[in-house]
């Protein structure tokens, strides 16, 4: 566990999945950094393989950002409605809880995605192909094979030809609205899954100019937030301490730490991915300014 300090993705232990058409390696960045709720991972899917059996979470939104490669998003609401969509670098996918069952299929060059999940309270996942429910470490019906093995026994997943028009839940970053601004050393140029309708998850990319900060020093009372560096360098500022960041660095901050944090961008700029959950009632505290924000647009002294 990182004790609230940055880690590098390559240093996080890899978990291997190989079951029939499923062939992928997962690095659980959130777990390695002590996340309480957020599930964050980098998943490398082998060429021509799937990431998982098709599945739908009962109470957990998921979002994916394609970091490298290309492939297909497989989605189904039932046996009479099965679709695939082409996906590639910088595509953003949002899967609301209890929505279409989905999985990812890599193309001939493989597929690497950054996956973010808000965290489930029930750990219930439905797998329509095997007609099973995953219940945390167990599954139902209890007398059936484990879900990955059960999926493999069904043989290849039938794939329809890709649909040209993609749904509103799949967008390239370049298609999303750019929210940008600069005030002193604070700067942002953000494209965010919230512009696709997400109200429980943040998954946003910022093109940060050299020498800027992503925010004032702050901490949240209820939210977890995290950052992944796609390119460039800088430092993770934690109170008076500074920790280096480079491409592949990951940093997660738990809620209510009492210590302010921010990203300070180096001279080459930074492509920064910001992730987090959206918790009602969260208060953002700015210890240097001695102010807090109990609601959007309202900042008060303390």
Stretches with model-predicted labels:
Residues 1-37, 126-202, 283-302:
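A short, N-terminal "cap"/entry segment at the start of jelly-roll beta-barrel domains
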Residues 42-46, 56-75, 118, 205-209, ...:
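Short, conserved beta-strand element in jelly-roll/cupin
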Residues 77-97, 240-257:
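Short acidic-glycine-tyrosine-enriched beta hairpin
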Residues 97-123, 255-282:
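Ligand-binding loop in jelly-roll beta-barrel domains
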Residues 36, 74-81, 98, 107, ...:
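Short strand-coil-strand connectors
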Residues 31, 52-57, 75, 85, ...:
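Short histidine-centered beta-strand/loop micro-motifs
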Residues 22-26, 41-57, 187, 204-220, ...:
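Conserved short histidine dyad/triad with adjacent acidic residue
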């Amino acid at each position: 566990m990182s004790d609230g300090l940055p880690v590098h993705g390559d240093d996080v232990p890899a978990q291997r999945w190989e079951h029939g058409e499923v062939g992928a390696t997962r690095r659980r960045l959130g777990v390695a950094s002590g996340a309480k709720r957020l599930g964050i991972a980098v998943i490398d899917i082998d060429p021509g393989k799937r990431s998982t059996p098709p599945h739908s979470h009962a109470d957990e939104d998921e979002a994916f950002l394609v970091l490298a490669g290309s492939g297909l998003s497989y989605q189904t609401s039932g046996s009479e409605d099965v679709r695939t969509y082409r996906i590639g670098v910088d595509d953003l996918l949002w899967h609301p809880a209890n929505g279409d069952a989905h999985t990812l299929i890599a193309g001939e060059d493989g597929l690497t995605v950054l996956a973010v999940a808000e965290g489930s309270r029930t750990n219930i996942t439905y797998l329509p192909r095997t007609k099973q429910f995953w219940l945390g470490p167990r599954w139902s019906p209890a007398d059936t094979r484990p879900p990955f093995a059960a999926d493999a026994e069904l043989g290849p997943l039938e794939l329809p030809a890709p649909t040209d028009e993609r749904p509103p839940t799949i967008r390239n970053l370049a298609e999303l609205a750019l929210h940008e601004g600069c005030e002193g050393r604070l700067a942002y140029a953000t494209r965010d899954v919230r512009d696709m309708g997400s109200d429980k998850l943040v998954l946003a990319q910022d093109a940060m100019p050299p020498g800027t900060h992503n925010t004032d020093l702050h901490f949240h009372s209820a939210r977890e937030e995290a950052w992944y560096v796609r390119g460039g360098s800088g430092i993770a500022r934690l109170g008076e301490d500074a920790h280096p960041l480079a491409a592949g660095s990951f940093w997660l901050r738990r809620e209510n730490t009492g210590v302010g944090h921010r990203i300070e961008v180096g001279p080459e700029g930074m492509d920064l991915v910001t992730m987090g959950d959206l918790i009602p009632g969260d208060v953002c505290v700015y210890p240097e300014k001695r102010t807090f924000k109990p609601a959007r647009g309202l900042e008060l002294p303390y």
